[in-house]
Design a protein with these regions (language model features):
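Catalytic pocket-lining loop regions of alpha/beta-barrel enzymes
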Residues: 16-125
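Divalent metal-coordination and catalytic microenvironments
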Residues: 4, 26, 60, 89, ...
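Glycine-rich phosphate-binding "P-loop"
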Residues: 1-13, 133
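Mid-to-C-terminal alpha-helical segments outside catalytic/metal-binding sites
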Residues: 114-122, 135-176
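Residue-level detector of flexible, active-site-proximal loop/helix-junction positions
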Residues: 65, 130, 172
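Small/polar glycine-rich anion-binding or flexible loop at a beta-alpha turn
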Residues: 128-134
């Protein structure tokens, strides 16, 4: 076990009001807090996340609605959290917010590329398989292809897929 997940959109999960006491309990173990939330809620939650004594992983690029682009207040909050050096963002599940849809989720590209430029060392990728909350399941190969579209080179892809998870989860270093 490496972290504790808060899912602010599903009943029965850890509640956000428990964030600080749970973070204090997991800190001695070197664990992180992982958050899935309704994206615009990040504006109000960001100061609390920034003050936590543990790393924070934000699921699904924050689930921030695409309207408003990279200027949307919640996305600006996400970038500020990344600048703090204790936040990680998963480049995952663009289907939660995309209006353009598969296979390339083009309306999510500007945000993903902005995250890659801002902090490639703080990004993770995940397929979100088995995609529990969507009726029309995406093609996981297409989702992985979007990562190649959002990044500039193979070194950045390796960083996101291999090096960053090694750093966050404490896995043994992968061979080059």
């Amino acid at each position: 076990m490496r972290g504790v997940r808060f899912h602010d959109m599903v009943a029965g999960c850890l509640r956000i009001d428990l964030l600080e006491p749970v973070a204090a309990r997991i800190r001695p173990h070197g664990w992180h807090v992982q958050i899935q939330l309704d994206g615009d809620g990040l504006v109000d939650l960001a100061p609390r996340l920034a003050a936590l004594p543990v790393d924070v992983v934000i699921d699904h690029m924050g689930r921030i609605p695409v309207a408003g682009g990279i200027e949307r207040a919640a996305f600006v909050s996400l970038l500020r959290l990344l600048e703090g050096g204790r936040c990680w963002v998963k480049l995952s599940a663009p289907y939660h917010v995309s209006r353009a849809g598969p296979p390339d989720y083009r309306d999510c590209a500007a945000r993903a590329r902005t995250l890659v430029r801002a902090a490639p060392e703080r990004l993770l990728w995940g397929s979100n398989w088995p995609h529990p909350s969507v009726r029309d399941k995406p093609d996981d190969a297409d989702l992985l292809d979007t990562l190649a579209d959002w990044t500039d080179d193979e070194a950045t892809i390796r960083r996101i897929l291999v090096d960053n998870p090694v750093a966050l989860f404490g896995f043994p270093a992968a061979p080059s």
